[in-house]
Amino acid sequence: MKNLTAPGPHQVRPIVQTNIGNPYSAAQMIALNNFSKEYYQLLVTCETDVFENNNATFPLDRALSQRYVPEEILTRCSSLSEEGIAELKTFPAIVCMENTGFNGITDPNQTAIFAYITRVKMEGYQVRVAFQPIAPFHQKILCEQKYAIYFDLNMSCAITDLNRTAWSIHKVNLFEAFNESGLGYLPHPSI
């Protein structure tokens, strides 16, 4: 995705424009309305072209391993079976680049993407995850101590959850986290 920047506070910049007044595509709306309200995925990468290619690659030891997934869904999601991948596709995702600094600090212009997963593919000793962006936002919001708790992120140490390439799942209602952190303008499921 080219020239993608986060909107200003309380603004939504459409990714896809349609003729019927809805700024989101049918596929995006279907994904939104099917999203889990119990879990979300966090994809943190060091790949600089992640938003141009809309995919990220993770080493197997940093892709949904025991350290990165709630115990109750570890077996079924981490196996990357057809059923596991189908379940993963129901979890909303945040995709971002590694923070530019330590201790919860990143460039104020760094963008994170609210997205949904479209494909998961094993490639040797790594996993490639393709995603479809829904909306951008400022990554620094995830780094702020007062908001990090709502996303189940640890920002109180030198190397935080956003400093290391990894694909993880958090037991958090992402839409409640958006509301608590001032990102309530991002699209939500209609139900």
Segments and roles (model prediction):
Residues 128-191:
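Contiguous surface segments at macromolecular interaction interfaces
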Residues 24, 39-40, 51, 68, ...:
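Sequence-level detector for tyrosine residue identity
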Residues 61-147:
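Structured alpha/beta reader/binder surfaces that contact nucleic acids or chromatin modification marks
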Residues 34-41, 46-50, 55, 122-124, ...:
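Extended alpha-helical scaffold and adjacent linker segments that couple domains
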Residues 21-73:
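N-terminal "first-domain core" detector
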Residues 1-13, 82, 102, 121, ...:
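Exposed regions on extracellular, virion, or secretory-pathway luminal proteins
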Residues 1-34:
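Long, low-complexity intrinsically disordered regions enriched in small/polar
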Residues 3, 72-73, 152, 161:
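Acidic/proline-rich low-complexity IDRs
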